Amino acid sequence: VAVPREMVRLAGGVNKRLGAKQKYELLLRIAAEMPVELEETDEDACGQENMLVFDDVEKPENTGLGWRTDCYVLGKYSAQLQEAGYFNAAIEAVLAEAQMEGRYEETVSYLEGMIGHKEEYYRIDEAAQPILIYKGDPVCYNILTIFAEQLGAALERRGERVLYFDQEEHDPREIIQFKGKHFKAVIGVQSCAFSIKMEDEVHYLHEYIYGPKYNFFLDHPIWGKPHFEHHYPDFHVLVLDQTYADFFRRFYKQEAILFPPAGMEAVEDSVERIYDLTFVGTYGGYEVQLQWIREQERPLRFLANRFLLTMRKYPNLTAEAAFSRTLEHYGMELTDEEFVEKMYAVRRVIYGAMHYYRHRVIETILQSGIRLDVFGDSWTHCPLRKYPNLICHPGVTVEEGLHVWRQSRMSLNVMSWHKGGFTERMAGIMMAGAVLVTDNTGYLSGRYDEKDMIIFDLEHLEELPGKIKNVLGDEEKRCRMAESGREKTRREHTWDKRAEQFLELLDNR
């Protein structure tokens, strides 16, 4: 039997949680959900790329499990069978076979669970349900929505059925329409939807939207404190940094999984690399964070100031490790709950440290005479404009940024204090064939090295200009590094790879 792949996808694909008769059950589902016509054809037509061919072969180890699929089918279509007058006959046939094979009591028990739609029924059935994705957050040049759409498209390419709820076009309260429904998974990207409460102000809406929930969180976990104090079953956080996963587990008691965002490539012919070194990012606002510290009451001001000094002095520490040292300085011993409360109160210091080192990295490059091309309004009046080799261009969208990287021989990344992380910017630069210039992160160890990119240490910025000049002065070496980085990144950091890994997460639950 040959079936159009799109028909298979729309029906929910093969249900791998069934131990046997997977193709049979899928064909039943297709017939139940859409009009089907059987047409006799030749083998050449069946072999077309848009067709999926099924045969009658079962894996030997699964041949004795078909009765469970029969029970599941009876549970799934019980209403239709009763309406057609076949329900009792189908039950009798399944039980007669069970009697003959000596598993009558086991079958009765399992069948009752399927017809009654107990937990095991939904465990199986959810695997053929659509994946619900929340999108529509316009922050950061729409990057969160782009992530949601990229992952969704990759899942569809793997045969998954994906539904989107656009939070920009719809009131988030409209998510109530999904109450009581089951999904293969529910995915958000830095989404507040998982924090929506019911009218009783006790329970959360997603306690009643069934299926595993996954929320990408791309910042330090301290910023998400108001949204991660809820606890309900089957909720997981996807993070880009292993130290963030550790933070979630320790301080929020939340299951967190290292799952960095993937890169994207501009779909275009080869372009001339007209820039030596680019930075596609904002200048930041160190002075803004200093002003915030000055405005705080004395105890908080002192704590925030010491926190900032510690982060500046020890730039390779995680934010929480630097805050621990800050507390030690004042002789403060706190419980985990108190630690989070205190750190949340001074969380803006993290931005201060990020912007301080972004300024220092870029100024170090400029002082060495290297030309740096930057993009966006934030550079127009920044202190670094005094350097004639800082070349400012108009702002770019995410898609235009991909083109800039294609035009760059190398491009700079300064981590937003992700000490164990990997970002879409890093992946995108390498996939564009530019050499990535980045501060070190624990994620790189064992995955990339200086044959793939330029890695610098925030504690030794004096070494950075020499590293850049060395590669810019040797085009053959630059091309080797760029190609090595691109090859590794295309293998491990595409959205198609993330879709594959996400489905593995679901399969291994």
Report each predicted region and the residues it spans.
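Nucleotide-sugar donor-binding catalytic core of glycosyltransferases
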Residues: 129, 134-147, 251-419, 441-444
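Active-site proximal beta-strand in glycosyltransferases
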Residues: 40, 204-220, 236-239, 278
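N-terminal pre-catalytic "stem/leader" segment of glycosyltransferase-like enzymes
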Residues: 105, 119-212, 343-346, 352, ...
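Conserved nucleotide-sugar donor-binding catalytic segment
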Residues: 1-73, 84-85
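Catalytic binding pocket for nucleotide-activated donors in carbohydrate/polymer assembly enzymes
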Residues: 132-139, 146-159, 163-170, 230-231, ...
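Glycine-rich, charge-decorated loop segments at or immediately adjacent to ligand/cofactor-binding or catalytic sites
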Residues: 221-235
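Structural motif
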Residues: 184-187, 212, 236, 410, ...
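C-terminal, non-catalytic tails of nucleotide-sugar-dependent glycosyltransferases
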Residues: 60-121, 371
